[in-house]
Amino acid sequence: MVQSMTSVVKAANFILARPTLSKIITPLAQKFTAYAGYREMGLKFNDLLLEETPIMQTAIKRLPSELNYSRNFRILTAHQLALSHQLLPAEKAVKPEEDDNYLIPYILEAEKEAFEKAELDNIEVKA
């Protein structure tokens, strides 16, 4: 089941708005992220998102050039590390505070535009 990033953001906001849920889910999410291991490869979470959708392609095209360059560099570095069966040293690995959602605003904007376009394409005019 493919979910839109909008629904994921709404679910995250719902969880974070409730203190009890937030106290339960946040530590679990932090443990899951730590065990995922992508930070030890030099990647940020947004680098792992599926690129082969039109919405993601639009979002990636809208990234500023320095963000796009650093994203490509992180992905190439991770590929090289995977080929050599190595991990980055702890001081070069991505820290949790550096793992920001740099791509999410662009994805949300592209999803909103795609939704509006779909609505306009399917509009029915009643006579």
Swiss-Prot record:
GO terms for biological process: mitochondrial electron transport, ubiquinol to cytochrome c; mitochondrial respiratory chain complex III assembly; regulation of filamentous growth. The keyword Mitochondrion applies. One of its GO terms (molecular function) is ubiquinol-cytochrome-c reductase activity. It comes from the Eukaryota. Keywords: Electron transport, Membrane, Mitochondrion, Mitochondrion inner membrane, Respiratory chain, Transport. It holds the Pfam family UCR_14kD. InterPro entries: QCR7, QCR7_sf. It is found in: Mitochondrion inner membrane. Disruption phenotype: Reduces recruitment of inflammatory cells and attenuates the virulence of C.albicans infection in vivo. Leads to mitochondrial dysfunction and shows defects in biofilm formation or the maintenance of filamentous growth. Leads to decreased vegetative growth on several carbon sources including maltose, citrate and acetate. Induction: Expression is repressed by HAP43. GO terms for cellular component: matrix side of mitochondrial inner membrane; plasma membrane; respiratory chain complex III. It is a peripheral membrane protein. Its main location: mitochondrion. Component of the ubiquinol-cytochrome c oxidoreductase, a multisubunit transmembrane complex that is part of the mitochondrial electron transport chain which drives oxidative phosphorylation. Plays an important role in the uptake of multiple carbon sources such acetate, lactate, amino acids or GlcNAc present in different host niches. Component of the ubiquinol-cytochrome c oxidoreductase (cytochrome b-c1 complex, complex III, CIII), a multisubunit enzyme composed of 10 subunits. The complex is composed of 3 respiratory subunits cytochrome b (COB), cytochrome c1 (CYT1) and Rieske protein (RIP1), 2 core protein subunits COR1 and QCR2, and 5 low-molecular weight protein subunits QCR6, QCR7, QCR8, QCR9 and QCR10. Belongs to the UQCRB/QCR7 family. This is Cytochrome b-c1 complex subunit 7, mitochondrial. It comes from Candida albicans (strain SC5314 / ATCC MYA-2876) (Yeast).
